From Swiss-Prot:
Pfam families, alphabetized: Response_reg, Trans_reg_C
InterPro entries assigned to the protein according to its UniProt record, in alphabetical order: CheY-like_superfamily, MtrA_REC, MtrAB_MtrA, OmpR/PhoB-type_DNA-bd, Sig_transdc_resp-reg_receiver, WalR-like, WH-like_DNA-bd_sf
Keywords: DNA-binding, Phosphoprotein, Transcription, Transcription regulation, Two-component regulatory system
Response regulatory domain segment(s): 4-117
Biological function: Member of the two-component regulatory system MtrA/MtrB.
Record keyword Transcription present: yes
Recorded GO MF terms: phosphorelay response regulator activity; transcription cis-regulatory region binding
The name this protein goes by in its record: DNA-binding response regulator MtrA
Origin: domain of life: Bacteria
Cellular component, GO annotation: cytosol; protein-DNA complex
Residue positions where 4-aspartylphosphate is found in the record: 53
Keyword Phosphoprotein set for record: yes
Processing and modification events after translation: Phosphorylated by MtrB.
Length: 225
């Protein structure tokens, strides 16, 4: 079954280029040029991933992202101009999984999309734990004392990466490669913002974390079991 990408961008020429590239890679695509309409499109089309421009008529991309993330774990990749560095952080804090700067190479875009869609439906049984948090890997389920903790797919992948190697301290660059699929140096703000988002969900007290620990000057590691 072909995976569906929803392109949300009011630049008609860019949206057409994205459609051509993505369809050439085997994806189905739909295009929306308005932020408010994008919310309806996500509910009706149930896309596997959303490519979301920051600057949109109707509702800007940051607000769209925030509303989507309130009730959906659909992967969101922001499209942004190089001058929008402040908005990039706001977008990540609002729930975006990744971002790509315009102008970009089609191969780079496709690689980012595939990285976010990469799932393994045949994962062997694997149960992990960090502190008092339990992780059922093949079921993509996280619980504390039997109560479900809702995570986005990327937040789940980040937690699993840490849990699988509890003695390892992960640099941000290593996490960018293992979780986001980057093969070159990239913006480590991606990691910092997602760790904050993950802590807000899995920690009893995010200001005093026991699940995802910071190793000052190095990176992050899993808390003790």
């Amino acid at each position: 079954m072909r995976q569906r990408i929803l392109v949300v961008d009011d630049d008609a020429s860019l949206a057409e280029m994205l459609t051509i590239v993505l369809r050439g890679e085997g994806f189905d695509t739909a295009v929306i040029g308005d932020g408010t309409q994008a919310l309806t499109a996500v509910r009706e089309l149930r896309p596997d991933l959303v490519l979301l421009d920051l600057m949109l008529p109707g509702m800007n991309g940051i607000d769209v992202c925030r509303v989507l993330r309130a009730d959906s774990g659909v992967p969101i990749v922001m499209l942004t101009a190089k001058t929008d560095t402040v908005d990039v952080v706001l977008g990540l804090e609002s729930g975006a999984d990744d971002y790509i700067m315009k102008p970009f190479k089609p191969k780079e875009l496709v690689a980012r999309v595939r990285a976010r869609l990469r799932r393994n439906d045949d994962e062997p049984a694997e149960m992990l734990s960090i502190a008092d948090v339990d992780i059922d890997v093949p079921a993509h389920k996280v619980t504390r004392n039997g109560e479900h903790i809702s995570l986005t797919p990327l937040e789940f992948d980040l937690l699993v990466a840490l849990a699988r190697k509890p003695r390892q301290v992960f640099t941000r660059d290593v996490l960018l490669e293992q979780v986001w699929g980057y093969r070159h140096p990239a913006d480590t703000r991606l990691v910092n913002v997602h760790v904050q988002r993950l802590r807000a969900k899995v920690e009893k007290d995010p200001e005093n974390p026991t699940v995802v620990l910071t190793v000052r000057g190095v990176g992050y590691k899993a808390g003790p079991p």
